[in-house]
Amino acid sequence: MADNIQPPIEFETPRLRLRQWQGSDLAPFAALAADPQVMEFLLPVPTRADSDALAARIRARIAGQGWGFWAVEHRESGEFAGFTGLNVPLAALPFSPCVEIGWRFARKWWGQGLATEAARAALQVGFERLGFDEIVAFTALGNLRSAAVMERLGMREDLDGAFDHPAVPEGHALRRHRLYRIARPKLG
């Protein structure tokens, strides 16, 4: 995998800039994280202090290894839209070790294809620059919006890979997750 490779921390798509986190991202990230619709399939809804601490951990990971959950900025407006990127999950998942792709966008940006656009660029970095052989994604069973993004990215559901997420309490409606996978495209 990509321990010593330092890809560019910032890269662009036609409408987005994926970059290192800045202090100006903290307030809009906290607002995104406090939105019950955004957090519908995630636990728990964080406090402002929790949100700031998460942003600091993400920023430190990018600073240390060159990649992670990049802040997503809308190029035309300059606004923070959310985050997208790659991560090695800390939880002991049944399919670990792995690299996951994930995203979270403010509701203002939903329905415009931005999550797919940003995630497609992150996958490209993961495969072409970092050399990962496979990237996974997972979500609670009921999160059909994220599952649809995974499918638009060309990811396929691992029908034998459904699992109970260890960070979600037993008996909670969000505990059961579906698993998607995508392999590095083969050339020629």
Named regions from a protein language model:
Residues 37-59, 68-70:
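Conserved GNAT-fold acetyl-CoA-binding loop/helix
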Residues 1-41, 73-188:
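Acyl-donor (CoA/ACP) binding surface of acyl/acetyltransferases
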Residues 66-68, 85:
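Glycine-centered flexibility motif
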